[in-house]
Amino acid sequence: MHRTSVPRLLFLVGLFLLAPCGAFAAFDPSLLVGMKARSIGPAGMSGRVTSIAAVESNPNIVYIGAASGGVWKSVNGGVTWEPLFDDQPVASIGALAVFQANPDVVWVGTGEGNVRNSVSIGNGVYRSLDGGRTWTHLGLEKTERIHRVILHPTNPDVAWVAAMGQLWGENPERGVYKTEDGGKTWSRVLYVDPRTGAADLIIDPRNPNKLFAGMWQYRRWPWFFRSGGRGSGLWVTQDGGRTWNELTEADGLPPGDLGRIGLGISRSQPDIVYALVEAEKSVLLRSADGGKTWQSANKKPDVNPRPFYFGDIEVDPELPNRVYSLDYNVRVSDDSGANFKTLVSGSLIHGDFHAMWIDPKNPDTIYFGNDGGIGISRDRGRTAAFVTNLPLGQFYHVAVDMQQPYNIYGGLQDNGSWRGPNTVWQQGGIRSHEWLQIGGGDGFDTLPDLSDPNMAYALWQGGNLGRINVRTGEWRDIKPSPPDGVRLRFNWNAGVATDPFKPGTVYLGSQFLHKSSDRGETWATISPDLTSNNPEWQRQNETGGLTPDASGAENFTTIIAVAPSPLQEGVLWVGTDDGRLHVTRDGGKTWASLEKNVPGVPANTWIPHITPSRHDPASAFVVFDNHRRSDFAPYVYRTDDWGRTWKSLVTKDLRGYAHKLEQDPVKKDLLFLGTELGLWFSLDGGGRWMKWTHGVPTVPVMDLVIHPRDHDLVIGTHGRAVYVIDDIRPLRTMSEKTLAQPVHLYESGEVQQHWRGAEPGGFALGSSEYRGETEPYGAILTYSLNVPGLPLAEEEKERERELAERQARRQEPEQEPRTA
């Protein structure tokens, strides 16, 4: 299927050419190439960047790795960016390295090493020999996350990898690995135990056989995190990894158990080495003799904040006493680490820094990576610019309103909650200033009040809920207060919903389900505790390990999914993080427990989303997510009898643990599913799943919404912001019968004429400005041809692409019809 924009009253035509058999059961999803999703951003608030590598001979060529948004490249110092990893099996990037002797050679270690509660997964090491245009997978699939890749400076076949291993379990595929044949084979050269991985790795710039490794024992459970243990330590090799020596208290390390260790080495004086060590009393250590002995440089309480999430240090390539610490801000010390001051504030270019690249030939040039994206300094950090054209937003949820054009609402990791248009009726695309922030913190569900276009609700971590008037900016906190003597437990990403029948009615889940009938002014509790209430899973005040970190991210035994039926008032489905599933059919007066009716799901499995059917009030879809116990299988179920029996919809085609299922409101067997590894769809109620690859990269797809009026599929991703597939109606009527016809014209929607204004002045930012894709011009006509033996050659595809590009560049008319 090909869709091409045609000016004015001509039509935008979709075409797909079918295989001669025309069999619906053997339908090839690549034939839907014309129904390409469009990336709408936003990019003004980007997403977490975990690694940066640039070409030393030309630092304008820079690569960045995103926590769950793949690899990107700029050839002009960050003015524009190109994604390079969209068609690879995973999107989580932990490490990048450029072979400077031939900078077309780029290595990637997948799986983020900043092990927060929402981190994604990797599957080993990749290498490109052509600057990122193509990639080869080099193995180490089970390492799960890689925080550092070190390349031999002159031998392109030699590399070392710091593999952290599983976050939510134990496995032997962790430690330091080495290849001497370009990744064909690997040797594990440093290993401690199944609980300890390599969190950092540095190489002596004058002696490639000398490396230091920071080993880290760590583990997450759904309700707890522990950093540190006997496995953690600092190791050194003098022979490229064949033998290692562990440094001890006798060498100057802190006594007792250690945690994460961040490492830095001076390029100008390699005998000067730094180690930021998590311990009962964390410390920055410095060695002036190449790591033989270590002295304390800084023991201040704030020397190592939140090491599980930060903990990296860098040394100025010219000034061996200038040390950078990456944490909430970028801090710098000019006295060998004894005293730090804030250099780049998180309030300037966003906070929570994870990556840094310093130009070794001109250390004034620095690239920073943080939870908001990329910052660039050209004066050694005295000033910094923030890059606003990387659409790496990590959305948790999306919602839509009924405005014209409609708006999309959503919350992002560490980037608040926002509202923005799905398209704009002017030239120039959807730009950052079109988006309005309506909530802060880690944004989660952000819901419009469909009875009042000026009102919306924004949820952030810990069940904090606010109501905002988007016209006036008036804000009100409406989180329910606990009754006397009761402690409410709210998940980091609590369940919330509005009622489809009663305007102004809101539901919010703690361990109880709370209901407000007056937009949050007052609340009533309408359920008993719907969780297991297991006290062993309620020790969040003790979480963190060596460094306490009771942020609320490990809050457990809580409600995380609240789903009112759109068909029958009083029907509510509720899911919890400890695997409890309930339904009420009388508005909360009575509740039925359902989880024991679901076959094949491990006990206590997370229930992130429930989708009540839009065709039958007794039907619902539930996704279960057990990756927090190192089980990455998808679990997707359907009931048609109020939860008494359940059918699995998982087939061998699916990849990635499941996040959200969306059922089409018109064709009940048309299903869309978001998993950790992309967007999937089924035309037969889940009998066969196909990956949607047209415009949607490999990325965690967290939420899906079908717009009830415009028939668009809105896709909220955790790593690549928001995508929209315009007008999915052809998928509703597609069948063996229609595909067997020589020619079939599919239903087209109403068309609304509107003024397509010129690009507004006063906002232009040059080449660096991000412009989200708007909906296509004209009505959309979609037809299929069934011509036996008719090929769809690559040159035909290329001609279609060229035609679309030419027409997109044409001068647009003053008035254009629009799909309503």
Located regions from the model:
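Bacterial N-terminal signal peptides that target proteins for export
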Residues: M1-F11, G346
